[in-house]
């Protein structure tokens, strides 16, 4: 497990890239998470995909207006669970989902064994953003990437979404770390909160600075920067993180909503304004 593989797409730069025509008019409704279902079918013509996208994407699910896309190799169950994850995460703040859609955000899931650069938005990452030491983006970002304004795709992988034993983010005890959820948390930050709630992000920065000053997440990924503090906190909020005691450079003993409330009440309070309490991330029912 190499935590740096989870780095957010926020670090990619500002090169121009496509944005889907996601214009849509609908009425949001307050549904219980148990009411959410996602059907997988062919990509509708109304998405106006460009040639590269048309060549790759062949499967589609609708997360209340946000396209969830995959290619020929992805299992439909992976798109279904990714779609349901989005619906579950965003049930409290569908205004943020609406802004993400208005900003052209889509979600994508690669098939088992595919590299992240199979996704059209990421196909040039090795050329545009070469990594040190000869690493490739397929190795570095094995679990997915968050959406940016330049590359508005929030992604994950089939093996992580469906908790395959081959998933590099699965603990030996069989508890899977939900990287799709982690990256979508980054996407909510950059594709919605940055536009609609800059004061919230100022509060988040203050909470992070206080956490660092008090060594709350020393020797963990959450300590690296405010973006990872947020995404790691969201994972714990949804009970979809790993734990380590003592800290191992990636995690510490905090990996649940209850533990977050005790150890970092400021972050817990902030997250409670964005995400619901009636949804948990992680493996779908029947996962290996």
Label every PLM stretch briefly:
Residues 33-39, 46-48, 52-56, 63-67, ...:
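Acidic/His-rich structured neighborhood in mature extracellular/periplasmic domains
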Residues 72-83, 174, 257-268:
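Generic detection of long, well-ordered alpha-helical segments
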Residues 1-4, 232-233:
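Short, well-structured beta-strand segments enriched in hydrophobic/aromatic residues
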Residues 3-32:
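Acidic, Ser/Thr/Gly/Pro-rich low-complexity segments and short DxT(G/T)-type signature motifs
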Residues 69, 128-158, 163-165, 204-288:
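Metalloprotease/metallohydrolase-associated module, dominated by Zn2+-dependent proteases
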Residues 18, 59, 97-101, 220-223:
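A general structural signal for short secondary-structure junctions and capping/turn motifs
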